Amino acid sequence: MRILVVSTVYNSTPPVGYGGIQRVVHSLTEALVRQGHEVILMAPPRSSCSGRTVHVPAYDPERPWSAVKGEGDLLSEEPLYEAMREFLDSERVDVIHDWSFQSLFVRRHPQHTPFVVSTCIPPGPGFERTNLVASGEAHARLIGGTTRHVHYGLPLRDWKFEIRKSEPPIHIAKIARFKAQHLAILASMRARRPLVVAGNVENERYFNFVVRPLLWLAPQVRYIGEIAGTQEALLRASALIQTPRWFDCFPLVVLEALASATPVIALAEGGLPEQVKHGVTGFLCHDVASLAEAMSRIGEIDPRACRADAQARFSDEAMARAYVELYQRALAGERW
């Protein structure tokens, strides 16, 4: 099968720094190539895959994602649309797999080529909903209709894991109110347990007026800034802490923790109850008190169960097979 995979335009694939969705797209392209498919990745400069890569204009670097998030012109994908139109005028593919935010080509030319559209967020009114694929069951239910879902997958054959944990729990996320690092810090203070907080500062006001003062009050909590990759950070951490205060559809870092044999302590928001098996691979919590209790009980979770669950449910090969099935349905003319 000849597959055009269209990535996002605001970061390279694989990403530089923060970029969960770009890591997912890269894992998918590599697995598809290994399974014998011809893959063409359309993505910004510095992107690459084991198949063929077609570079397209990146989003304006002078207006980074964090600066425009929430604006009406969040991402101008017209240059991506023009690049896709020019490419498809001269080359044929069997199916388009579109991970972009606006899906402009398939919206404007729905009969041109069979397509599948993946989303990592709850799409707004202007987003494409035909042949839409969510990241999990809860995400699909939120979108409604006939939306399908495919779980993200990781290259587990290359993913290091460690059963013996020697480092404190770690909270990994960009520093923003909806990621609620302050709840993790308060839980650490209540449990009197150490904590590492990692992530780039997206919301300066939240960091300066909420997170930083708590760090002053909690000497056992260490902020280390943005990390280049999650594997080393998660390898020996006794737990991953996640405290989303929004519908976090299917956070990739949770799968990365499980692949590292690292238990997860998380608020039961969005897709997290689908990812974490309470009492088996971690604990699902509802407030600071239950987060603190879970931090005190993390030794009850067997890291081997975390790794086994990742292997059973979240491999890149399983993700690729599930998507190939949807590609075949789209090729057969099915619409959902």
Question: Each predicted region: which residue ranges?
Answer:
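Conserved donor-binding/catalytic core segment of Leloir-type glycosyltransferases
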Residues: 144-198
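Short acidic/histidine- and often glycine-rich active-site loop of Leloir-type glycosyltransferases
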Residues: 268-279, 283-286
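Donor nucleotide-sugar binding/catalytic pocket of nucleotide-sugar-dependent glycosyltransferases
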Residues: 116-160, 164-168, 222
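A charged, aromatic-enriched C-terminal amphipathic alpha-helix characteristic of glycosyltransferases
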Residues: 35, 74-79, 299-336
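C-terminal "capping" alpha-helix adjacent to the active site of nucleotide-linked donor transferases
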Residues: 283-304
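Acidic donor-binding loop of glycosyltransferase active sites
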Residues: 235-249, 262
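Nucleotide-activated donor-binding/catalytic signature segment of Leloir-type glycosyltransferases, i.e.
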Residues: 199, 208-227
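Short hydrophobic beta-strand element within catalytic cores of glycosyltransferases
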Residues: 259, 263-266, 276
